C-alpha cells in the first residue's frame, strides 16, 4: 500500500522501532514483573490506567522524534522533499498513515493488559475499550498542539501531563460508582470523537504542509 510505503520512507526507522515494537514489549515486561511481585493484586482496573498512562506518554513524546515541530514555520526538517514532484504527496500519505497507525498500536499495547485481566478477573471489554478510545483520542488530538513545540523539555512536561490525565481518567471513569452506568455512553462519545480528531488533525497538518511549500515558492 502506497500510504504505508511513504510512511516508512518519511519516518525515522528508530521512531517506528521504538513506538511500534519496543513499547509493546516493554509494557509486557513491566506487567510480567508486577505480576511476579504482587500476583493477583495487580490485575485490576488500575493496570488499565497504568497501561493507558504509559502508552499516552510514549505517544506524545515519541512523535517529537518522528515528526517534530512540523507545524512551525522553518522547522519542517524535510525540505529535501520539496525537490521532488511527489514529495508533498509522500508527506501527506505519511501523516495520514501515522494517524491511522496510532489507534491500532494503542489497541495492541492495551491488549497486553486485557488478556491477563480477562483470565484472572473477568470480562475486560469495558476497561479495554475505554482505555483504547481515551488514549487514542489524546494521542491524535494532542498533535494539534505538540507539533508546534520545539523544546524537548516542554515536550517532556506535556508527556507527563498526558500520562497523568490518561491514567487518572481511565481509573476514575471505571471505578466511580456515579460514572460506571455512563461508561458505554462515554465510550460512544469517544468513538465518535476519534474519527473527527483524525479528520481535523489531518486537515491541520495538510494545511501546514501546503503553507510550507508556498513559503518555499
Where in the sequence are the language-model features?
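Hydrophobic alpha-helical transmembrane segments of membrane proteins
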Residues: 1-76, 92-217
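Short helix-to-coil transition segments within interhelical loops
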Residues: 81-89
Amino acid at each position: 500500500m502506497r500510504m504505508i510505503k511513504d510512511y516508512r520512507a518519511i519516518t525515522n526507522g528508530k521512531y517506528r522501532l521504538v513506538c511500534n515494537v519496543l513499547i509493546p514489549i516493554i509494557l509486557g515486561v513491566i506487567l510480567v514483573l508486577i505480576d511476579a511481585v504482587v500476583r493477583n493484586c495487580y490485575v485490576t482496573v488500575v493496570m488499565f490506567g497504568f497501561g493507558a498512562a504509559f502508552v499516552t506518554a510514549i505517544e506524545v513524546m515519541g512523535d517529537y522524534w518522528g515528526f517534530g515541530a512540523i507545524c512551525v514555520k522553518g522547522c519542517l526538517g524535510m525540505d529535501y522533499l520539496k525537490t521532488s514532484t511527489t514529495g508533498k504527496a509522500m508527506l501527506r500519505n505519511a501523516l495520514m498513515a501515522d494517524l491511522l497507525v496510532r489507534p491500532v498500536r494503542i489497541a495492541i499495547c492495551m491488549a497486553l493488559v486485557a488478556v491477563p485481566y480477562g483470565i484472572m478477573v473477568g470480562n475486560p471489554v469495558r476497561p479495554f475499550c475505554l482505555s483504547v478510545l481515551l488514549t487514542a483520542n489524546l494521542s491524535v488530538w494532542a498533535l494539534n498542539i505538540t507539533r508546534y513545540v520545539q523544546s524537548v523539555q516542554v515536550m517532556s512536561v506535556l508527556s507527563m501531563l498526558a500520562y497523568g490525565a490518561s491514567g487518572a481518567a481511565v481509573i476514575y471513569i471505571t471505578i466511580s460508582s456515579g460514572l460506571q452506568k455512563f461508561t458505554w455512553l462515554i465510550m460512544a462519545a469517544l468513538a465518535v470523537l476519534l474519527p473527527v480528531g483524525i479528520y481535523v488533525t489531518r486537515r491541520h497538518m495538510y494545511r501546514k504542509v501546503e503553507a510550507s511549500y508556498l513559503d518555499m515558492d
